[in-house]
């Protein structure tokens, strides 16, 4: 910017420089060394604003305090700026005809690439920049439209070189022929080239089909918003309809649709797979029905497998001629594939009968469960005591529902039945039949039920004593008539006159001695006692039984103060029951036997307790003996250690 280098400036040039921003001040206020003497504009607002003034580039910005940037226009293109045509005279037209003066600061011609930093407002080189300081794309609409549509992206349009300067009349008059004649010629030539090169653009045609998305593009419409890669592709998009691409498939279309041979093979494969799946489902359904009926056999599947094998064999591809010469293993393998309904989906290592394996597993599970049930039942037999056999079981009068339940009917909760009504009907219908049931227990239970139903309040002391006396009489009668029971643990003789008292745990020697005495005296005492009691069993039991029944009925009537509830079989046992005397005697005998069994069980439990006490005592003695031995050993060890320490 030296005055010696530049020619003398006139008033117009001075005014233009005062409106042009100082490039050094735009970079930094301290960069410009001239300060207030600088002939260019120093605007802080323009320095902070990166946008360029559009009016400045058009040559008509009249605001001296414009907040937009006014970059220099003459040094960017290598020629001085000329004013507008309306502001200059005719002799001044010859000024642009002068030869362009290169920038003396740079000394080299500028390149045809616009400066990126200048467009962002950050170029600090100014006139020394080797790139063109061009405005942004919005600065000149007409050349910008021409560049995007028709000109290649890499070659700038000649009109762009003068876009930073003021446009003159000659440029404006010559621009329309240059802009609008080229599209007509290119479109005309493009249609001819389009017909010649239509079949050579298969890849681009498939791309257009995906880009259209179902919409047609008219032939006369030009895409101004996207620069096309080449002239031929742009014309193909604008001038050819969708139908031509469909009617003329390209070699690359096989990538999307596939060949005809592939489609045929795929359809045959799908049909064959569907046929196999359908037949396989029918075959599996048939096997499941047979398996659910618990009659699964391979012979039932013979006909179905044969039909399925023939149908699948007919649907398969023809086998080669060398199939007949194959060995036995290959034939078996093929036969297994034909028989397996899932041969089309499962590999050879899975060619097995799934239903057969399932049935075998089910059968093995059933056998294991049955064996486990047998073991558990044998273990629980000694722990769980089943209900005693009742009169209904002995007479075969078990209800039909319990008989239907089988052997587990006794383990299930018993059903509530009217024992009194059934007992009364049985006594009336079969008075002479040998009833060896539990008549006495049933009568006592009936009386207890009657007492529970007719309970009116607490009983007096006399009633309780009478009931206790009746119970003692019944026990004495049962002890006289009951036989001597023998168990596996201990044999005892029950006698009401000499009862066995439990004095406490006894040693093992005393228990064994008592057992030997019982075994030796059993043979002699059993026969004599049986003969003594056999004569008076029937008469005594009859009398005791009748007395007990009368006492029970009397106590019920006295305790309630009203007519007591009497079951149908609690009628007066007088002459009406004279035919059933034998039945009553046998019932009393059975009741005494049950009492004996209960006493035997209690005696066995006492014996178990005694044995446990004896075993515990022996173990304690043995433990004490071991403890003494351990103490002696410890003393010996201690003495030995002390001796070692002393020495």
Curated annotation (Swiss-Prot):
GO molecular-function terms, A-Z: DNA binding; mRNA binding; zinc ion binding
Low complexity composition bias: residue spans: 86-106
Stored PANTHER family: ZINC FINGER CCCH DOMAIN-CONTAINING PROTEIN 19, ZN-FINGER, C-X8-C-X5-C-X3-H TYPE-CONTAINING
Species in which this protein is naturally found: Oryza sativa subsp. japonica
InterPro entries, sorted: Znf-CCCH_3 (IPR041686), Znf_CCCH (IPR000571), Znf_CCCH_sf (IPR036855)
Region entry Disordered, spans: 78-106, 155-280, 308-327, 335-452, 512-580, 586-605
Zinc fingers (C3H1-type), renumbered ranges: 16-45, 47-73, 109-136
Upper lineage: Eukaryota, Viridiplantae, Streptophyta, Embryophyta, Tracheophyta
Full protein name: Zinc finger CCCH domain-containing protein 19
Biased composition annotated in UniProt, kind: Polar residues: 160-175, 189-203, 369-379, 435-445
Bias type Basic and acidic residues, positions: 267-280, 347-359, 419-433, 527-536
